[in-house]
């Protein structure tokens, strides 16, 4: 299966498209201008569409992905603020846009061609709304408020309207700054990375008396035995096998590997690796064979091979990219 890598370069105002070979060798095949600075990108695989959040004109550009991975611009959709995170519901009928600077989460229907329409709901006063992601098993949207040290929970109705759950808020540690979120493949466990205190929270989601509950079961540092004052954590991802989790910090320029306990799904720190300067974004391919980290300040990205047995990373190569790479995605072409 052919794989391509998309890199969003904010200051260069472009998206680069790279081929990724099984060996880990990569080559640039396309560079497409974005008519503005770019931040989040995301893909709906079954539609072969890529969505990019653009500012300062605050819009989402929809691109089609052809059989070779090349992008072609299809549409522009206005949004009411700067996009920081883009995600979708399970059926890919609605697009969720988080805005850290404008403090909101918006819901936009996708038409039959996958084009975002005007938002049908905007929830304001979510201070520092940095990310929002849907738990498909429980039909709950987790909306992260970095500045409030909390996570809001919403059910998604059939009509695309968000409504608060019974337990409508999760509190993280004070001044922790929750930033990004991922789910275990079984969807029963949640991992959130805290930008400001250098920790990861592990949450368990379950039903009790037919009511969905979420409880914190672990808080662990991204760096073993280094409890320092300054952290600047950014991204977090898990392998599709559910055995390994990775998290990075921009202050220390590291990416850490955790093993996931197969009995309780808590994290066990394994190792940290020095990586590119200011690692803002990284991604893992669907086969769990490669991990790529983009250095926002170094204007480079590094590709690692992943050990199937331990999750350890082995450097393969470093490539130069555009100015300020802020988002990276690995996409398997159908």
UniProtKB/Swiss-Prot annotation:
Keywords: Carbohydrate metabolism, Glucose metabolism, Hydrolase
NCBIfam families: PRK11028.1
A family per Pfam: Lactonase
Coiled-coil regions, chain positions: none
Taxonomic placement: Bacteria, Pseudomonadati, Pseudomonadota, Gammaproteobacteria, Enterobacterales
Protein name: 6-phosphogluconolactonase
Family: Belongs to the cycloisomerase 2 family.
Family annotation (Gene3D superfamilies): YVTN repeat-like/Quinoprotein amine dehydrogenase
Highest taxon of the lineage: Bacteria
GO CC terms: cytosol
Any single biological process term in GO: pentose-phosphate shunt, oxidative branch
Catalytic reaction annotation: 6-phospho-D-glucono-1,5-lactone + H2O = 6-phospho-D-gluconate + H(+)
Pathway membership, UniProt: Carbohydrate degradation; pentose phosphate pathway; D-ribulose 5-phosphate from D-glucose 6-phosphate (oxidative stage): step 2/3
Chain's role: Catalyzes the hydrolysis of 6-phosphogluconolactone to 6-phosphogluconate.
EC code: 3.1.1.31
A single GO molecular function term of this UniProt record: 6-phosphogluconolactonase activity
Primary gene name: pgl
């Amino acid at each position: 299966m052919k794989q391509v890598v998309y890199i969003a370069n904010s200051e260069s105002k472009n998206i680069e498209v790279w081929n990724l070979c099984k060996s880990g060798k990569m080559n640039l095949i396309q560079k497409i201008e974005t008519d503005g600075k770019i931040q989040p990108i995301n893909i709906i695989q079954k539609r072969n569409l890529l969505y990019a959040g653009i500012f300062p004109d605050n819009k989402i550009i929809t691109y089609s992905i052809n059989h070779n991975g090349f992008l072609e611009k299809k549409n522009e959709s206005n949004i009411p603020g700067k996009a920081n995170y883009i995600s979708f519901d399970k059926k890919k009928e609605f697009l969720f846009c988080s805005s850290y600077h404008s403090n909101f989460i918006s819901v936009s229907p996708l038409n039959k061609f996958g084009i975002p329409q005007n938002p049908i709901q905007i929830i304001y006063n979510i201070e520092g709304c940095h990310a929002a992601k849907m738990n498909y098993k429980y039909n709950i949207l987790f909306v992260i408020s970095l500045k409030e040290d909390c996570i809001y929970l919403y059910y998604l109705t059939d009509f695309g309207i968000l409504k608060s759950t019974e337990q409508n808020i999760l509190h993280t540690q004070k001044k922790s700054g929750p930033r990004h979120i991922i789910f275990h493949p079984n969807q029963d466990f949640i991992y959130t990375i805290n930008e400001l205190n250098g920790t990861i929270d592990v949450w368990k989601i379950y039903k009790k008396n037919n009511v969905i509950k979420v409880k914190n079961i672990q808080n662990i540092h991204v760096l073993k035995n280094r409890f320092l004052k300054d952290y600047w954590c950014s991204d977090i991802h898990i392998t599709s096998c559910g055995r390994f989790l990775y998290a990075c910090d921009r202050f220390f320029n590291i990416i850490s590997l955790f093993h996931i306990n197969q009995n309780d799904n808590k994290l066990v720190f394994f190792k940290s690796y020095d990586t590119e300067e200011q690692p803002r974004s990284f991604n893992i391919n669907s086969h769990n064979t490669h991990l790529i980290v983009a250095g926002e300040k170094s204007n480079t990205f590094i590709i690692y091979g992943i050990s199937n047995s331990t999750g350890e990373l082995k450097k393969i190569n470093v490539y130069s990219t555009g100015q300020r790479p802020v988002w990276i995605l690995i996409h398997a072409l159908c």
